[in-house]
Regions:
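N-terminal secretory signal peptides
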Residues: 1-8, 20
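Short alpha-helical segments used as structural interaction elements across diverse proteins
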Residues: 6-8, 12-13, 51, 124
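N-terminal export signals
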Residues: 12-30
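Mature catalytic domains of secreted/periplasmic carbohydrate-active enzymes
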Residues: 30-465
């Protein structure tokens, strides 16, 4: 869902071919509770709410009329971004909203399963790039007010989060590909051309190469869009009580204009002072991003330990929103990614797209059930923990809590872990079984071995203290 240039190119190539280190000692390592993001020469620091780095895992819920058409978000609108059977002209796409009727919508059922699986926070899609609002907004002309009799899909979700005990988070795209204020030549200007081919800003020159309009006229367009965005923010951030997280997506607007990014961020923090914001409210022409933490790792793994507070987001079923009964990665994969991210001080945002009728696929509950079994014995190793010295002083990922090191055996073939710079332990045990694990000193190193009686399971964790 991230609309950055490199991701766009990589994703396009893939889809055409097939388908958005820290120094020791440990006390000085993560968790660093300052956001750190560098673009060009600008670094943005801001204190983040302490719950977020401790939380570890979030549930992303992208949903909307696109789910009816079994297409990913609004990307089917672009004829050059999808194969012919996945391309939806504007009129056909907008007609999906008349068929979007989640009569079996029961968010509490989703969230109970998610809570048991270890998820701590959420990001419910309020509006994606197609501009469809999931609540009866007074701003804009595409949403439940026009197509669902004014039904509010947001309030039941918020109330269910609070009953279940999950942090309330929203995902919102200020970009609106279908925004069509009176007097403009076509919908979606200037992020597309009249044939709805995807175009992007030429940031390096500060000029919008995709629009044959002067900057003042373009500025007028964005001022009108800003009024809609601000109005919608005023609704969702005052109607539903305390909101813990706002996950921006797609604020990728052209250079050379004021797209109100800083004003938007300031306005949100005025309405919700304790809210956590990601870094996708972008100010490309000013050489920096805003927000509290980095979301640089979308559907890809970091090659080295990222700096500061960060989150990886991933569509484990192949696409963000519902695209039919596509295969999903197994629970063991989700647990492994969570463990690796936590060992480097990051969070993991996992995406599952609900069906258009409001139900979740059975595979969602299967994955959550398997994760819940693992969480019952090993959840302490991934929540409210610090990053460990991996790979500097351990050959397996390590998380730390107090005086305990949690060793994550992620490969079924690895039966021993080697640690350096650690005192001889007083206790070494397998979390899943409670059995003692053997250890020995070897040339100033400590080698911890899994008991032979312990079969290889997903992320076998050994606690060393």
């Amino acid at each position: 869902m991230r609309d950055n240039e490199s991701l766009f190119r990589r994703r396009t190539l893939l889809k055409r071919a097939a388908m958005a280190g820290l120094s020791l000692p440990l006390a000085a390592q993560q968790q660093d509770t300052e956001a750190f993001r560098r673009i060009g020469e600008t670094v943005v620091h801001r204190k983040i709410q302490p719950w977020f780095p401790k939380a570890g895992m979030g549930l992303f819920l992208p949903w909307g009329p696109c789910s009816v058409g079994e297409i990913e978000g609004g990307w089917g609108l672009f004829r050059d971004m999808r194969p012919p059977n996945k391309y939806w002209p504007i009129e056909k796409y907008m007609a999906l909203a008349d068929r979007f009727n989640p009569q079996n919508y029961d968010p509490e059922k989703w969230l109970v399963a998610a809570k048991q699986a270890g998820f701590k926070y959420t990001a419910f899609l309020l509006r994606h790039h197609d501009g469809y609002a999931m609540w009866p907004t007074e701003y804009g002309e595409f949403g439940t007010k026009q197509h669902m009799g004014g039904r509010d899909l947001v309030r039941p979700f918020v109330e269910a989060c609070r009953r279940v005990g999950l942090k309330v988070g929203f995902c919102y795209s200020p970009t609106d590909w279908l925004f069509n204020p009176k007097g403009w030549p076509w919908r979606g200007f200037p992020l597309r051309d009249p044939e709805f081919k995807y175009r992007r800003p030429e940031r390096s020159r500060g000029l919008p190469r995709y629009a044959d309009m002067p900057i003042p006229q373009m500025q007028k367009y964005f001022d009108q869009l800003w009024a809609v965005v601000k109005g919608q923010m005023s609704e969702v951030l005052t109607r539903y009580g305390k909101i813990d997280l706002l996950w921006w997506d797609g604020y990728d607007w052209p250079a050379g204009i004021d797209h109100h990014g800083q004003e938007l961020e300031d306005y949100v923090r005025k309405l919700q002072p304790d809210i956590v914001l990601n870094d996708r409210n972008m100010l490309w022409d000013k050489g920096r991003t805003l927000g509290d933490y980095s979301t640089a790792f979308e559907n890809r793994n970091p090659a080295e330990r990222p700096k500061g507070v960060w989150e990886q987001c991933e569509a484990v079923c192949g696409t963000w929103s519902y695209e039919g009964e596509s295969p999903c990665k197994p629970a063991s994969y989700v647990i492994e990614r969570l463990a690796r991210n936590r060992a480097w001080g990051g969070n993991y945002m996992v995406s599952f797209g609900p069906r258009p009728d409001g139900t979740m696929r059975p595979v969602f509950y299967e994955i959550c059930s398997q994760m819940a079994r693992w969480m019952r014995h090993s959840g302490e190793s991934v929540f409210d923990v610090e990053a460990g010295p991996y790979p500097e002083r351990s050959d397996v990922p390590v998380t730390i809590k107090g005086g305990t090191w949690y060793l994550h055996f992620l490969s079924p073939t690895q039966r021993a872990a080697t640690l350096t710079g650690i005192k001889p332990p007083s206790s070494v045990r397998v979390l899943r079984t409670g059995q003692a694990a053997s250890w020995k000193e070897d040339g100033g190193r400590v080698v911890v071995s899994l008991p032979e009686s312990v079969p290889a399971k997903m992320d076998e964790v050994v606690a060393v203290s």
